């Protein structure tokens, strides 16, 4: 869950988000080292008037600064490709939920059940209860079982939308006429908030997403009541 004036990323709740956090730290370390080296060289050039004539046309130096960037790019690309394949891999999901974007709300359908579907609207500010979050609460939360693989099928009824939950490392575009899919698996129970992340009109910022991850026994009870 995010908090005011937060500078870092949200705490990871899924294996994918854990991998993304590690990749972020890995890449940031490389960028920091390169930036420090460049700033050091620039400071030397500005504070000294010495010129190394032997390096002005050195074949060895040309070779080094051609090969070294290639190695650095490989060190960044390999873990990135691994995470991309992990995000696209879907093996025997335990549950499938179809998500449709509308102007300006989301609708959800649990395809493994005959009649389990609902719309999810943002709760207006004047109707919030004490302790609820402004512009983040919805009237119907998406209840899902924790520690189980859930497949989300995402599309749109009208314009481009985007379904995003930062704590789970999810962001999938909802495109009219196209069905995109992604998977999620939360490692612990709780409420996980997401916000709309596609400019599609005047009320695009009023389409929050709330996932309620619960134990399987609670989910079975909830689904029986909803059906």
From Swiss-Prot:
Q: Name one Pfam family in it.
A: COX2
Residue positions binding Cu cation A2:
196, 198, 200, 204
Q: What class of enzyme is it?
A: translocase
Q: Which UniProt keywords apply?
A: Copper, Electron transport, Magnesium, Membrane, Metal-binding, Mitochondrion, Mitochondrion inner membrane, Phosphoprotein, Respiratory chain, Translocase, Transmembrane, Transmembrane helix, Transport
Q: How is the cofactor bound?
A: Binds a dinuclear copper A center per subunit.
* Membrane topology note: Multi-pass membrane protein
Task: Report the principal subcellular site.
Answer: mitochondrion
Q: Which GO terms describe its biological process?
A: ATP synthesis coupled electron transport
One GO molecular-function entry: copper ion binding
What PROSITE patterns does the record tag this protein with?
COX2_CUA, COX2_TM
What does it catalyze? 4 Fe(II)-[cytochrome c] + O2 + 8 H(+)(in) = 4 Fe(III)-[cytochrome c] + 2 H2O + 4 H(+)(out)
**Binding-site residues for Cu cation A1, renumbered to this chain:** 161, 196, 200, 207
Residues binding Mg(2+), per UniProt: 198
Q: Mind telling me which residue stretches traverse the membrane in this protein?
A: 15-45, 60-87
Taken from the record's topology, the Mitochondrial matrix segments are: 46-59
The protein's required cofactor(s) are namely: Cu cation
Q: Report the locations given in the UniProt record.
A: Mitochondrion inner membrane
- Stated family: Belongs to the cytochrome c oxidase subunit 2 family.
This molecule's function is given as: Component of the cytochrome c oxidase, the last enzyme in the mitochondrial electron transport chain which drives oxidative phosphorylation. The respiratory chain contains 3 multisubunit complexes succinate dehydrogenase (complex II, CII), ubiquinol-cytochrome c oxidoreductase (cytochrome b-c1 complex, complex III, CIII) and cytochrome c oxidase (complex IV, CIV), that cooperate to transfer electrons derived from NADH and succinate to molecular oxygen, creating an electrochemical gradient over the inner membrane that drives transmembrane transport and the ATP synthase.
Under NCBIfam families, the record lists:
CoxB
For this protein, the record's PANTHER family field holds: CYTOCHROME C OXIDASE SUBUNIT 2, CYTOCHROME C OXIDASE, SUBUNIT II
- Assembly description: Component of the cytochrome c oxidase (complex IV, CIV), a multisubunit enzyme composed of 14 subunits. The complex is composed of a catalytic core of 3 subunits MT-CO1, MT-CO2 and MT-CO3, encoded in the mitochondrial DNA, and 11 supernumerary subunits COX4I, COX5A, COX5B, COX6A, COX6B, COX6C, COX7A, COX7B, COX7C, COX8 and NDUFA4, which are encoded in the nuclear genome.
Q: What is this protein called?
A: Cytochrome c oxidase subunit 2
Q: Which organism is it from?
A: Lycalopex gymnocercus
């Amino acid at each position: 869950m995010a908090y005011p004036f937060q500078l870092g990323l949200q705490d990871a709740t899924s294996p994918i988000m854990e991998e993304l956090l590690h990749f972020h730290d890995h890449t940031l370390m490389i960028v920091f080292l390169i930036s420090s080296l460049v700033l050091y060289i620039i400071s030397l050039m500005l504070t000294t008037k010495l010129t190394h004539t032997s390096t002005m046309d050195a074949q060895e130096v040309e070779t080094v600064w051609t090969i070294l960037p290639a190695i650095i790019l490989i060190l960044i690309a390999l873990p990135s490709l691994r995470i991309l394949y992990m995000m696209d891999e879907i093996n025997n999901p335990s549950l499938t939920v179809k998500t449709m974007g509308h102007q300006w709300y989301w609708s959800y359908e649990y395809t493994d059940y005959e009649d389990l579907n609902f719309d999810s609207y943002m709760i207006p500010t004047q109707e919030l209860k004490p302790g609820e979050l402004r512009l983040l609460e919805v009237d119907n939360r998406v209840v899902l079982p924790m520690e189980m693989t859930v497949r989300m099928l995402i599309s749109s009824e009208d314009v481009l939308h985007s379904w995003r939950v930062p704590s789970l490392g999810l962001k999938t575009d909802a495109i009219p006429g196209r069905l995109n899919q992604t998977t999620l698996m939360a490692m612990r129970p709780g409420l996980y908030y997401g916000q709309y992340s596609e400019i599609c009109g005047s009320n695009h910022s009023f389409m929050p997403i709330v996932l309620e991850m619960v134990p399987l026994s609670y989910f079975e009870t909830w689904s029986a009541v909803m059906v």
